[in-house]
């Protein structure tokens, strides 16, 4: 009887040891793994006019970072915050996301904000396709013209000077109020 009890204890301890080793391995813990969308979204992105969007995608669906406009009178970087679908569909659809930049920093206050809403599409040529709304503070009488609408495509490849020039000549607009005011 004593040998059976000792054998049972030994088997139990071995099982506990194997279970503890398996759960100590972070690659086995789904919470420790970074989602493909999270890993793909995090980084530095550029739009067709050369503006820079630096973002970190959190496991909880948060987007944080900075936006630096390449056009208009914007100076330095502006804080951005947003959200993305941290559990996106697995059917090949894009990952829904959106973020906002209030055009106020230590250098300027344009009394406006831009929101981008779109989809992250991963792969070899990852991109973020967005539509944006730029709303500026106005008088009640001018409220009808307070919001501009446009679109941006962001990639992780910085555009060349020639492609930026071509986009400008094609009339591509942007979500920067400091540029819109001058137009």
Curated annotation (Swiss-Prot):
It holds the Pfam family Avidin. It is found in: Secreted. Residues 37-159 form the Avidin-like domain. The lineage of its organism: Bacteria, Bacillati, Actinomycetota, Actinomycetes, Kitasatosporales. The keyword Secreted applies. Belongs to the avidin/streptavidin family. One of its GO terms (molecular function) is biotin binding. This is Streptavidin. It comes from the Bacteria. SUPFAM superfamilies: Avidin/streptavidin (SSF50876). The biological function of streptavidin is not known. Forms a strong non-covalent specific complex with biotin (one molecule of biotin per subunit of streptavidin).
């Amino acid at each position: 009887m004593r040998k059976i009890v000792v054998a049972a204890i030994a088997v139990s301890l071995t099982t506990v040891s194997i279970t503890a080793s398996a759960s100590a391995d972070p690659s086995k813990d789904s919470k420790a793994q970074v989602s493909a969308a999270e890993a793909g979204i995090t980084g530095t992105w550029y739009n067709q006019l050369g503006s820079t969007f630096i973002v970190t995608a959190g496991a909880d669906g948060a987007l944080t970072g900075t936006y630096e406009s390449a056009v208009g009178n914007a100076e330095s970087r502006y804080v951005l915050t947003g959200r993305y679908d941290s559990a996106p569909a697995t059917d090949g659809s894009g990952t829904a996301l959106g973020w906002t930049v209030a055009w106020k920093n230590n250098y300027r206050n344009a009394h406006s904000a831009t929101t981008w809403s779109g989809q992250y599409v991963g792969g070899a040529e990852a991109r973020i396709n967005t539509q944006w709304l730029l709303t500026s503070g106005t008088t009640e009488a001018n409220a009808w013209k307070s919001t501009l609408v446009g679109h941006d495509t962001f990639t992780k490849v910085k555009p060349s000077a020639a492609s930026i020039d071509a986009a400008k000549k094609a009339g591509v607009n942007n979500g920067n109020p400091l540029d819109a005011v001058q137009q």
